[in-house]
Swiss-Prot record:
It comes from the Bacteria. Coiled coil: none annotated. One of its GO terms (molecular function) is NAD binding. NADPH binds at residues 13, 33, 106, 141, 256, 280, 282. This is Glycerol-3-phosphate dehydrogenase [NAD(P)+]. Pathway: Membrane lipid metabolism; glycerophospholipid metabolism. Catalyzes the reduction of the glycolytic intermediate dihydroxyacetone phosphate (DHAP) to sn-glycerol 3-phosphate (G3P), the key precursor for phospholipid synthesis. The active site is at residue 192.
Amino acid sequence: MKEKIAYLGMGIWGFCLASLLANKGYRVVGWARNPDLIAQLQIEKRHPQAPDIPLHPNLSFTTDMEEAVNEASMIVEGVSSAGIRPVSEQLKAITDLKVPFVITSKGIEQHTGLLLSEIVVEIFGNNASQYLGYLSGPSIAREVLKGCPCSVVISAYNPDTLKKIHNAFLTPTFRVYPNSDLKGVALGGALKNIIAIACGISDGFHFGDNAKSGLVTRGLHEIRKFATIMDCRPDTLNGLAGLGDLCTTCFSSLSRNTKFGKLIAQGLTLEQAKAEIGMVVEGAYTALSAYQIAKHHKIDMPITTGIYRVLYENLDIKEGIAALLQRNTKEEYL
């Protein structure tokens, strides 16, 4: 009998990785709360955000989480960062973590400032950390679904867990590189979305590629500074989980965070832009916590601060841009 993997969350990214695992021969059971989405997947055999991609026969769907995780040798989550707490609490009511649990979402929880892995440990207990894994890196779902080459990072505290997850996801076109710095991998994926919103705003004002490259470079500097106070290895952010993911998210026309930034530049409010995108915009969610943590630790993060003030304090977008451009220059420190 084929080895079973449970996948919690059937947005486009969840469907993408669930399809990858199904293509490798695993029996994948995808779960989502939305009964309409599950019914559509079961009946039409297509995902509404990828109607041109046929459903693999190894992939099935359910709204019953217990059915999804029962006898699964691995559990993968692909819900929003805001959804990982309620989903983990629902999972805890069904089972303790005794198999690898792979986080593929990117964000920092609002109000608590917890990384998504820390939320899982808080709910399941410290013993759960040995089963935790984190997958991140430059990976636009549509490109992965089409079989385009892609390189990502997988991290875990336990070497055996790391090996199992690495072997499950690795394919000739989906390159998976191990990295032992789980917190650094998680932070890179979370914070790059804020910088992508800034790049989208820059695009919205037609500032050009020079401005965007400057934002990416200085944005990476902000992310590295943030990582130092979170006990991460700053060099992790020079790799796929940091620079790689940052470049893809900031320069891709498929990036929802960049699209969101363009809408903000056009004068839409936070809620209007989110409604227009129609999907979760993780950078908008994470900006609040990132700003609060940076302020608490007295870290100078001007791009992050600017995005936070525009989104949550109704700062005029042009005033925010002017504040960035009028900052005193100093020795470039990388």
